[in-house]
Amino acid sequence: MDRHSSYIFIWLQLELCAMAVLLTKGEIRCYCDAAHCVATGYMCKSELSACFSRLLDPQNSNSPLTHGCLDSLASTTDICQAKQARNHSGTTIPTLECCHEDMCNYRGLHDVLSPPRGEASGQGNRYQHDGSRNLITKVQELTSSKELWFRAAVIAVPIAGGLILVLLIMLALRMLRSENKRLQDQRQQMLSRLHYSFHGHHSKKGQVAKLDLECMVPVSGHENCCLTCDKMRQADLSNDKILSLVHWGMYSGHGKLEFV
């Protein structure tokens, strides 16, 4: 039983290690607005564990952004490098941004509500930008909480299933042991009864035959033969219902036994 428990414990540890490796080094999901991502709900999986956001036109600072998985980029030599572009005011802006978490390149309404890059200024635009940033923060927090619960469920369900399997195996082993012990006890009792009945029957037969031979010998010349034996034999016959071949008689005194 201890050996089976140790094997099951080692198996559970290996399963937990495998799940931890899959969760830490597995693929991540990225927000993708390309045409081929429409069928997958505007999401893609990155084997490089990296998402990107970049300008459609690097020469135009007001160009809209595109998002996707880093695996879909044709050129991988300058991946995730701080590529810079200059706008009309002379300030530098990044043309490619990379991140390495689930849906990290999803900015919600930020791309729509944010002012044009570079020349946009003014207090109203700053307020609008701050409001969109707060909305993005709330959306990201909600997404991260859902991801956390999903990962917790992915870890907890196999562990719970493994524990239930271990309990069922232990219960089955216990039931089999108790059933085996009960069958062994019944078999031992049956063998003991057969042994005692066989030997007891033969010993009683031997005692009755010995009593018959002893009572055939006369004790005296003028008294009944073996009155004590007669009483003992009658008691044995009443209990065991065994008939003897010897009939009782009277000793005549002439030296012979007369049968009745």
UniProtKB/Swiss-Prot annotation:
It is a single-pass type I membrane protein. GO terms for biological process: cell migration; negative regulation of BMP signaling pathway; negative regulation of osteoblast differentiation; negative regulation of transforming growth factor beta receptor signaling pathway; positive regulation of canonical Wnt signaling pathway; positive regulation of cell population proliferation; positive regulation of DNA-templated transcription; positive regulation of epithelial to mesenchymal transition. It is found in: Membrane. Pfam families: BAMBI, BAMBI_C. CDD domains: TFP_LU_ECD_BAMBI. GO terms for cellular component: cytoplasm; plasma membrane. This is BMP and activin membrane-bound inhibitor homolog. High expression in kidney medulla, placenta and spleen; low in kidney cortex, liver, prostate and gut. Not expressed in normal skin, expression is high in melanocytes and in 3 out of 11 melanoma metastases tested. Residues 1-20 form the signal peptide. Negatively regulates TGF-beta signaling. PANTHER family: BMP AND ACTIVIN MEMBRANE-BOUND INHIBITOR HOMOLOG, RIIA DOMAIN-CONTAINING PROTEIN 1. GO terms for molecular function: frizzled binding; type II transforming growth factor beta receptor binding. Residues 174-260 are cytoplasmic. The chain crosses the membrane at residues 153-173. Belongs to the BAMBI family. Keywords: Glycoprotein, Membrane, Signal, Transmembrane, Transmembrane helix. The keyword Cell inner membrane does not apply. Glycans are attached at residue 87. Residues 21-152 are extracellular.
